[in-house]
Amino acid sequence: MKNHMSDMSPEEVRQLVRKGQMTGPTAGMAASYAQANLVVLQKDLAFDFLLFCQRNQKPCPVLDVTDAGSPVPAIAAPGADIRTDFPKYRIYRHGVLTEEVTDITPYWKDDDVGFLIGCSFSFEQALINQHIPIRHIDEGVNVPMYKTDIDCVPAGPFSGKMVVSMRPIPERLAVRAAQVTSRFPAVHGAPVRIGNPQSIGISDLHQPDFGDAVTVREGEVPVFWACGVTPQAVIMEAKPDIVITHSPGHMLITDIRNESLAVL
Amino acid sequence: MKNHMSDMSPEEVRQLVRKGQMTGPTAGMAASYAQANLVVLQKDLAFDFLLFCQRNQKPCPVLDVTDAGSPVPAIAAPGADIRTDFPKYRIYRHGVLTEEVTDITPYWKDDDVGFLIGCSFSFEQALINQHIPIRHIDEGVNVPMYKTDIDCVPAGPFSGKMVVSMRPIPERLAVRAAQVTSRFPAVHGAPVRIGNPQSIGISDLHQPDFGDAVTVREGEVPVFWACGVTPQAVIMEAKPDIVITHSPGHMLITDIRNESLAVL
């Protein structure tokens, strides 16, 4: 067994998860590879949700969509099974969390469609590679996330405001952070705003709507990126009969190298 | 009236088209703005086609998708009507071209979904801005297009090979051409291949499958980009009851500035 799960291959991590030997958060595992969020919807809602993602690519960057009834993400991880390879799942009925499980095989239906959504871990790695510090990692907490007053473009029953994540960046590095993350449109891409939280409807940085507050130091500017919590919030508002998501922080390790997601 | 249609606004061109006063090709009109290809499908095929586009973004870059039954592309051109604002349309029944018309209002159905697909005009403008010559423009012909042996990722009934367009580029500028077009993933983006046509199944550059052959000069390398003819070819193979497309070269002028499509 490898000393560090960060050195494992995606398949090695997925095997541990599939066997139930790893049920915790996936941050830092198989570090060069993209991790994916999950949304499972029934086929009748799949077109409108895919359309919502297409219209709101910054908060909803789609890495892969499974064929109806197939649990295999053929593009992102052909050897994976989305019913078993996330460490933890949440089941929502009519917008209410009813169960948290480690295997959704009993819930899987013939017309289910799985959406794998890109995650900020990929661009955080790119920032770290540039020696740009990530405060919530250094402080050992979840990234702070905020509801904004930015409207998503609606599609069918799906509509709502964009949720953003915030990372405090030294002012001299803010432009570099924008450049570096612009290379990765498949995982939220460039920031939506640098500084001035009020301008996007955030009144108090110390009171995030999701995740944990982090320290913003003298000489740092808060930088806001579109966040994958957006599609989840939008789906809950639409209150489908049933929707399955990953549990926060408990992602699928794909076979896609972070660096291969760069457009330049 | 403006001296040159290249200086007109998108809305001005669309008005002329809508009134039937302009029924020709749109190349060069409202030159700073993105032009869009069209595919209209009935709702029951829309999910699989959107999925096909999501899985094959280089040949099928989606700029906008209309809500079922709505002819208004709310993101790309909120003042436009896709039933009247393309100069010419083609109607295909079971994969066979049956009519060419200038107005599809009589054909429009309550559950029709319109897909606006990005077009190479946008990145050609970016190349021209870098003083990289575009041979088929200089020779006054259509861009040469070739079927390759590159498989698209299938989705539902949609599958087939990628079609590419070719532009001969001076060898010293080929890398620059790749860089410049990489900025525009929403309009086919980076080349799929530089040189060696045989490596993607093209046996004779002088015999394009679509469009016209162009001169490749000494010291030039053929550069291949994914082409918007791909989704059309794939749809014809699927032989839906009815599908409506724009006529080749007869595009919609959107309100999206080419330069705003750049990711960097």
Curated annotation (Swiss-Prot), chains A, B:
Q: Which InterPro entries match?
A: D-Glu_cyclase (IPR009906), Putative_hydro-lyase (IPR038021), UPF0317 (IPR016938)
As one GO molecular function, the record gives: lyase activity
- Name the EC number(s): 4.2.1.-
- Top-level taxon: Bacteria
Q: Does the keyword Hydrolase apply?
A: no
Question: What is the enzyme's main class?
Answer: lyase
> Which keywords fit this entry according to its UniProt record?
Lyase
Recorded family membership: Belongs to the D-glutamate cyclase family.
What name does this protein carry?
Answer: Putative hydro-lyase RBAM_004300
Source organism: Bacillus velezensis (strain DSM 23117 / BGSC 10A6 / LMG 26770 / FZB42) (Bacillus amyloliquefaciens subsp. plantarum)
Taxonomic path: Bacteria, Bacillati, Bacillota, Bacilli, Bacillales
